[in-house]
Structure formats: structure tokens, C-alpha cells
Amino acid sequence: MMAECDPTDGEPGNGSGDSTPETNFLSSEVPAVLFEKTRSAPSLGLSLNPGAAVRISDSTESVLTELEADGSGEEALLLPGPAGSLSPRAGKEKRTRRNMLSSSSDNLASPGNSSGEFNHFPEDPEFGEIIQRAEQAIENGVFPERISQGSSGSYFVKDPKGKIIGVFKPKSEEPYGHLNPKWTKYFHKVCCPCCFGRGCLIPNQGYLSEAAASLVDQKLGLWIVPKTKVVHLASETFHYNAIDRAKSRGKKYALEKVPKVGRRFHRVGLPPKVGSFQLFVEGYHEADFWLRKFEAEPLPENMRKQLQSQFERLVVLDYVIRNTDRGNDNWLIKYEKPGDGELTEKESEWTDPKDSAIKIAAIDNGLAFPFKHPDEWRAYPFHWAWLPQAKVAFSQETRDLVLSRISDMNFVQDLCEDLYEMFRTDKGFDKTMFEKQMSVMRGQILNLTQALKDGKSPIQLVQMPRVVVERSRSGGQGRVVQLGNAFTQTFHCKRPFFTSW
């Protein structure tokens, strides 16, 4: 067991409380720089896929009969205004009867078109094309397949040819979601309610955490998280309650038997679910698999350096977002070398080609962005901290890549604003709680900045005193942040009951 670093070793205070009194962020004890669809049928008597969603509108005088919600209780805003799209960074347009009718007049949508109304990514057409293929597959009866592993409802999403192209994790089927199809967390809640959930995380924000981790990864230039965004999908293989399925069957029956009534429905089919969609990566294995092999058969020096560089990027990502669920089974390694299958002698020996590559994929980022440091039962440690790679000091390559960004406070402020635009789309968004999440992240960035400057190793990084960097009430709110009075720091000294370092 590694003992947690005591901030009292180098800071004033006795550490008996939860935190020391706030001090000005520019005190002498703090580093000088804080952060340096077309019509699908000729008539209304079309045959519908069981899991498809269809919106019907007779004319501009059609009556919108209802606005349904998906399993998570969130409104399914399926009729955007005349602008045509709803981006994560855009404010939600006021939905009046006039603009809802004008946007849907004389359109007979194909199955699944209602979820497609949300899934517009003009800034990333390649990702949008992948989502379109996923929607087409569902329309054609190639439904997502539930993943057996894990404690939540997550699904392999396929293209029309049946090839896996992504992993979809609906909000309503998260580990503590009310429509989670797996019983593990239900028994946890019933049998051990005192330990239910993670007290440092906001419930049911896993899908946002997944997408936000991808955003942080891109902003820092790490490129180890498969691209992840928030999308809306509907499929009969998702877990819906009995009422939603009964309503879907009733509406489809009414549409087929009584078209005049059926065409007045806002949507026919199951409601789309909001969740995170992460691109599927091929050729990767769990880290445990390769780490054991690398231990038995050491890598050549150039490959070892590549692995160390990729590992350090994983450390940077996990530390900044304070991932509370990083084991060696939810990050992946891909080792590429020529001649696989062609070696006839000494196949167990590693080759040393120039075009070989080791890559890491950081998946399962849904339990990150806590609003406080873990201080109750468990510490939720980073399991990579016990690997031999964690004992090696951060390389110059990593310092050159990351330090110039996180040392710039305006870069950090821009990152917080981008995360705000993403998180505010959630129905249960709380600005106060979000600011607490950002305070933890700023503290993590502060520690990482100092560790990179001091040439520390990942294991030394996780042993640094935990810091929360909060915006001062008197601090400015503009984009250009002044260091003098913008933030204050607090050392978080309360330890979890079970500590890991």
C-alpha cells in the first residue's frame, strides 16, 4: 500500500479538517504560473420495422398531439426550428406550435428519421456519415447488439453490412439509470444502499463524461480516445419500459388501420435515446494481455519508448479528468509489426522494424469529472500507478506536447467553456455543480503543470496533495483571465476510508 501524500509536509495547517482555509492563488507557496431521409413508402400502408421511429405529418394544419419522452424522462425534441439542426454548442430554440408545424409539413419520414433530426455534425462530416450509416442499418433491421460485459446497457452498433462501427451507451441504461437492463446495480442498490453509487460523481452523466473525455483528449493533442460524441438513436434492442413498447405498437397499428388518425401522431415507433457514441477501434487488446507479454518478452528499445510515450498520454488524460474507473481492463493496446503470420523461426522474438507501432486507446471514460475528490469509502485509484512505466519520469516529448497548453490559463478557460457548452445540454444540468467539477479539473491541471516542470514521474504525480482551484467571487468573468485575483486554491486533505497511496 502506498501512503497518500500529506499536504502538511510542505504547506501550513495541520490537515485535521477537510481542507485548509482558502489562500490567494498567487501566494509565494504556489508556482509562479498557474497555467503557462426520403419517403420510404408510396402509401401509408407501409410495413414498419418493429424498432423504427416514423414521424407523420398530413399538412401544415396537422395537429401535434403529444410530445413524448424517452426512457430517461428527457423530452425528445424531434422537430427543430426552421434552421434545421441543433448543435451541442447552440442554445435550444424556443419550440412554438408555428415553427414545429412549419418544419414538419408534408413530410413522411422514413423509419429512424426522428433520431436523425438530432444527429447533425457539420463540423465533423466524417462522424456524421458514420452515424447516418448506423441509422440506415437500424432502418434495415440490422439492430445494435447488447454487450454482455459491464454493469450497464451498452451496445455494439453496426453498419448496413453488419460490421461493428461504434459503441452506444444510452443515458437511461447507465449503471445507476432506471432502465439499466442488468441486475448487478439493482441488487447493489437494494442490498447495500449505504454504498450505492459514487459519492463524488453526479449521477447519470456518464454519457457526457464519455464525450467530454474525447473533447479534452483532442484539445490536449493526445489522440488516444476514440472519437466520441452525444447522439440520439432508437432501436428495438434497446431496453424500453412496457409502456413505451405498448405505445409504439398501438401507434403503428393505428397508422396501418386508420391512417387519418395515425398521421396525426408526432412519432410512430420507439423514442430515441440520448447517449454517447464512440467509434469502434479494431486490432486492440486489453492492456493486461499485452503488458503480460511485454513483461515476459521485453520490447526493443524503440518500441519501449513508443509504449512509454503512449502510456504518459493516458496518464495525462486520466489525471486531468480525474477518471475514477481506470483499471488495466478498460484501456487497450495495439501492437503492429510486419511479418505477423510470416515468421517461421523464433516467432516468440520481437522484431525491430521502423514501421512498427504501439498505440493505446483509452475507452470507458464514463466515470470521470467528479465534483469533489473521493473522500468517503474508496479512493478510486489509477491502476496504472502500479505499473513499472509509472516509475519513469515524464519524457521531454510529453512535456513539449502538453506543458505549453496547460500552462496557458486562457487555454484552460477555453476548455472549461467548451465543456460548459457540452454539459449544459443535459436536462439535469446544474451550473453550481458544473463549476465544482471544473474546480477539481483546474486543481488537477495545476498539479500536472508542476509535475511536468519538476520532471516527476506518474507515481509521484498521483502522490501530490490534492488541490481544488475555485473561481474567486471577485474574480473577472471575461475570456482573458487575469492571474491576480481570478482563482483561489484549497488543499483537500480528507482521506477516503480505504486509501491506496
From Swiss-Prot:
Ranges of biased composition (kind: Polar residues): 17-27, 99-117
Q: Under the GO molecular function aspect, what terms does this record hold?
A: 1-phosphatidylinositol 4-kinase activity; ATP binding
GO biological-process terms attached to the record: endosome organization; Golgi organization; pectoral fin development; phosphatidylinositol phosphate biosynthetic process
User: What are the GO cellular component annotations?
Assistant: cytosol; early endosome membrane; endoplasmic reticulum membrane; endosome; Golgi membrane; plasma membrane; trans-Golgi network
Which keywords belong to this entry? ATP-binding, Cell membrane, Cytoplasm, Endoplasmic reticulum, Endosome, Golgi apparatus, Kinase, Lipid metabolism, Membrane, Nucleotide-binding, Transferase
Q: Where is this region: G-loop?
A: 147-153
- List the catalytic activities from the record: a 1,2-diacyl-sn-glycero-3-phospho-(1D-myo-inositol) + ATP = a 1,2-diacyl-sn-glycero-3-phospho-(1D-myo-inositol 4-phosphate) + ADP + H(+)
* Bias (Low complexity) ranges: 76-88
Going by the record, the broad EC class of this enzyme is transferase
- Write out the residues that bind ATP: 154, 169, 278-281, 292-293, 364
Pfam families according to UniProt: PI3_PI4_kinase
Bilayer topology annotation: Peripheral membrane protein
Task: Say if the entry is tagged with keyword Ligase.
Answer: no
Q: Where is this region: Disordered?
A: 1-30, 65-122
Q: What is its main location?
A: cytoplasm
The UniProt similarity line reads: Belongs to the PI3/PI4-kinase family. Type II PI4K subfamily.
| Name assigned to this protein | Phosphatidylinositol 4-kinase type 2-beta
Provide the taxonomic classification: Eukaryota, Metazoa, Chordata, Craniata, Vertebrata
Tell me what gene encodes this. Answer: pi4k2b
